[in-house]
Regions:
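C-terminal regulatory
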Residues: 118-120, 130-251, 278-281
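Central regulatory/effector-binding core of bacterial HTH transcription factors
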Residues: 73-136
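Short amphipathic alpha-helical coupling segments at ligand-binding clamshell hinges
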Residues: 88, 224, 260-274, 279-280
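Residues within the DNA-recognition helix of helix-turn-helix
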Residues: 11, 17-21, 92
Length: 281
């Protein structure tokens, strides 16, 4: 019994207790025990034949899963923020599938946080650190920040702000995350944080819609730099108050457990990191 416990890396007392529970459940003795010997009873011999069959099936099942786990294939369910997903990542995911045609993607585009424990979602791409410390977060763009921006058309009608308090005279496009309106905008200057309470005539829980309002000249948006990188590059949006650093908005790939880090997930993480690095300002 002690040798079996050592092989299973458990205490001998735990092994004895487990055997006793099994015998109680079966209503029979499987072993004849003494202080010096241990041998199977007739019932134990019969039970062992079936137990070996079950253990073999378990080993074969584990081997099958492990073989699959070594290949970049199968179903992969993703949750991605609205603006980043629609306007940045969708073509990248097409590329990823072209590289790995055995992958089947299921994509949920939403700014609402998916419940990775209850919903059938393998991984989520999220801004910020997960509130649940039990989750695994792999950095994709750890240094990403928010930028304050507006369209050239907006700045033709309104003077560019020179200091944070000027934002109180601008139409600021606010975003809802969960049940909270993101209306206190945080910035950094000379290693000190400063914040300003903003107001405006539009609020949405869809980041893509906030960006579209900014493009249409409806107001100023405080967006992740990744979300608006293409618009900034092409001059459709312009950064203002650039002498302030925007609030950190690190992007992570999040999953409920480290066992979810299949080769497909790790490969996707590496692929996205390489693409996101190209968007750095």
């Amino acid at each position: 019994m002690s040798a079996a416990a050592r092989e299973l890396d458990i205490a001998p007392a735990a092994a004895s207790a487990a055997l006793k529970r099994l015998e109680t459940a079966l209503g029979t003795r499987l072993f004849v025990r003494s202080t010096r010997s241990l041998r199977l009873t007739a019932d134990g011999e019969r039970y062992l034949i079936h137990a070996r069959t079950v253990l073999l099936a378990i080993d074969e099942g584990a081997a099958s899963v492990m073989r699959d786990a070594q290949t970049i294939a199968g179903d992969l369910s993703l949750s991605i923020p609205s603006d980043l997903g629609r306007n940045v990542m969708l073509p990248w995911l097409d590329e990823f599938q072209a590289l790995h045609p055995a992958i089947r993607l299921r994509i949920r585009i939403s700014d609402r946080l998916a419940d990775l424990y209850r919903q059938t979602i393998d991984v989520a791409i999220r801004y910020g650190e997960p509130e649940d410390s039990g989750m695994v977060a792999l950095p994709l763009a750890p240094d990403n920040r928010r930028v304050l921006c507006g369209s050239p058309a907006y700045f033709k009608r309104h003077a560019m702000p020179k200091k944070l308090s000027d934002l109180q005279t601008h139409n600021c496009l606010r975003f809802v995350l969960g049940d909270a309106v993101h209306e206190r905008w945080l910035f950094w200057r000379n290693k000190k944080s400063e914040s300003v309470m903003v107001n405006g005539d539009r609020i949405s829980d869809d980041g893509d819609l906030v960006r579209r309002w900014a493009l249409a000249g409806r107001g100023l948006a405080y967006k992740s730099q990744l979300d608006v990188s293409n618009d900034l590059k092409k001059g459709r949006l312009v950064v203002t108050l650039a002498h302030y650093k925007g609030e950190l908005a690190p992007l992570n790939l999040v999953c409920a457990h480290r066992l979810m880090l299949s080769p497909a997930v790790v490969s996707l993480r590496d692929f996205l990191r390489a693409r996101l690095d190209q968007l750095k300002p």
